[in-house]
């Protein structure tokens, strides 16, 4: 089987069953003897779940099965039965965040340097078959404001939050980053043309993925007026690829 996008090749074993018009039959595709007077043989082919699991990732995989038919006794070739097989394979989309817990450094002046969070997006095929990505960043603190995400005081939840922004560009590119608004979806088209430069583990396999780094920047604050303590926040990344398969 050949992936039409990546040209990767994987060998899978096709199993099957045959039966003649005389109702005799058997398993496999070799040694089929007994066309009898009706001269008709029906072949049923299938791929087991075990074989399908050998595919390294999703996408469209093509193969051609050719059965040679011979006339009994003389063993002269009658012809070939050619079957084109196409598998449209898709796994569940997934997101990899290798370092999902980050710290935003704070100085005594209330300023902070940006921190990058690396993420990688697996569209369910790993072959770039999704032309459209929809992405959304949700702030789970419940205290987001405008285009700012919030960090809440762990021991004093009613204290004034610290705020930070999240910036990101088009996945898979080095384009300019823009500040995202919590809970607001963005749609990116032409994603089947961007480089698939990353890898991630999902479902026991290593699959290709599209890199999408996020930049977190803590907003300036007055340390004198800010309640002391540890501040925490959480972002939920929602990724919805659309799959275009022929």
Predicted region positions:
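Signature of Gram-negative chaperone-usher
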Residues: 1-46, 141-223
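N-terminal small/polar-rich segments of proteins
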Residues: 44-169, 212-234, 238-246
